[in-house]
């Protein structure tokens, strides 16, 4: 199960497509990609 946008995340969790875990904030943010 992937983590949705602004969902809490840690290094061991995978965010959903086009999202990346923000180390600074500790939640999933958009990684800037569309494809």
UniProtKB/Swiss-Prot annotation:
SUPFAM superfamilies: omega toxin-like. InterPro entries: Huwentoxin-1 (IPR011696). One of its GO terms (cellular component) is extracellular region. It is found in: Secreted. Changing residue 13 to A: Reduced ability to inhibit nociceptor cation channel TRPA1. The record marks 6, 19, 27, 29-31 as: Pharmacophore for Nav1.7/SCN9A. Keywords: Calcium channel impairing toxin, Disulfide bond, Ion channel impairing toxin, Knottin, Neurotoxin, Pharmaceutical, Potassium channel impairing toxin, Secreted, Toxin, Voltage-gated calcium channel impairing toxin, Voltage-gated potassium channel impairing toxin, Voltage-gated sodium channel impairing toxin. Disulfide bonds join 2-16, 9-21, 15-28. Changing residue 6 to A: Decrease in ability to inhibit Nav1.7/SCN9A. Its main location: secreted. It comes from the Eukaryota. Expressed by the venom gland. Changing residue 30 to A: Decrease in ability to inhibit the channels TRPA1, Nav1.2/SCN2A and Nav1.7/SCN9A. GO terms for molecular function: calcium channel inhibitor activity; potassium channel regulator activity; sodium channel regulator activity; toxin activity. An unnatural amidation at Ser-35 provokes a 14-fold increased toxin ability to inhibit Nav1.2/SCN2A and a ~2-fold decreased toxin ability to inhibit both Nav1.5/SCN5A and Nav1.6/SCN8A. The primary structure of the mature peptide is identical to that of Beta/omega-theraphotoxin-Bp1a from Bumba pulcherrimaklaasi (AC P0DQN3). The presence of a 'disulfide through disulfide knot' structurally defines this protein as a knottin. Ion channel impairing toxin that inhibits voltage-gated calcium channel Cav3.1/CACNA1G (IC(50)=53 nM), voltage-gated potassium channels Kv2.1/KCNB1 (IC(50)=411 nM), all sodium channels tested (Nav1.2/SCN2A (IC(50)=60-104 nM), Nav1.5/SCN5A (IC(50)=76-358 nM), Nav1.6/SCN8A (IC(50)=21-133 nM), Nav1.7/SCN9A (IC(50)=51-95 nM), and Nav1.8/SCN10A) and the nociceptor cation channel TRPA1 (IC(50)=389 nM). Acts as a potent and selective blocker of voltage-gated calcium channel Cav3.1/CACNA1G, but not of Cav3.2/CACNA1H, and Cav3.3/CACNA1I. Belongs to the neurotoxin 10 (Hwtx-1) family. 54 (ProTx-1) subfamily. This is Beta/omega-theraphotoxin-Tp1a. It comes from Thrixopelma pruriens.
